[in-house]
């Protein structure tokens, strides 16, 4: 977790100081306690926590953008973008091999307006969370405003799992707009993901 320790000790003990250093404490305050020193240490700890949170959020946004670029690349034949695809897979640390099953799901919405980014991201994250129960991961891209393209990969979904996934997508998108949904055949390997699309 993102914590920033501040040590306050009633003893001038070298072992406490070593422990504080090992735990990367922001400050080590000894008796007699000085309220100004405590306040400054807490403010510094707060600032460090906020910075860690911002860094984590920026990394998450960058990761989602990279995953979206990968999904867009998979909507074209593999040979056209092999190097970029390989680079993005490595950057995202995805466990994809030439035997990984891929299934494309395309939703065509009945809107001319782009979904707000926060809403599209929230929907993607809820899809991803839902799929975890089936040991399936996904990447997502919005294409030409009306098309939501998901590439599911990981375990091969059986008929019951496909039905559950289909129902989940229908429930998720029915709250927003009218839409059509289509799922491609499950194919083996990222080089064939385009064929599912």
Predicted regions and their residues:
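Alpha4-beta5-alpha5 switch/output surface of CheY-like receiver
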Residues: 13-16
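A broadly used, surface-exposed interaction patch
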Residues: 2-3, 168
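A structural micro-motif
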Residues: 3, 138, 176-179
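Alpha-helical scaffold within the catalytic cores of cyclic-nucleotide enzymes
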Residues: 160-176
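Conserved phosphoryl-transfer motifs of two-component systems
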Residues: 3-4, 26-28
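Interdomain helical linkers/hinges and coiled-coil/dimerization scaffolds
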Residues: 21, 25-27, 33-164, 183-195
């Amino acid at each position: 977790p993102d914590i920033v320790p501040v040590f306050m000790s009633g003893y001038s003990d070298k072992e406490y100081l070593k422990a504080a250093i090992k735990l990367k404490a922001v400050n080590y305050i000894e008796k007699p306690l000085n309220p100004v020193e405590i306040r400054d240490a807490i403010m510094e700890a707060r600032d460090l926590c906020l910075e860690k949170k911002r860094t984590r959020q920026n990394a998450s946004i960058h990761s989602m953008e990279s995953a979206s670029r990968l999904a867009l690349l998979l909507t074209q034949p593999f040979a056209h973008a092999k190097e970029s695809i390989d680079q993005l897979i490595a950057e995202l640390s995805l466990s994809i091999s030439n035997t990984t099953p891929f299934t494309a799901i395309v939703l065509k919405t009945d809107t001319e307006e782009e979904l707000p980014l926060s809403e599209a991201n929230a929907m993607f994250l809820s899809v991803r969370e839902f799929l975890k129960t089936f040991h399936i991961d996904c990447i997502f891209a919005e294409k030409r405003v009306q098309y939501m393209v998901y590439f599911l990969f990981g375990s091969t979904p059986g008929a019951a799992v496909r039905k559950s996934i289909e129902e989940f997508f229908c429930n998720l998108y029915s709250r927003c707009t009218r839409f059509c949904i289509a799922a491609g055949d499950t194919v083996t390997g990222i080089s064939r993901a385009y064929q599912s699309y």
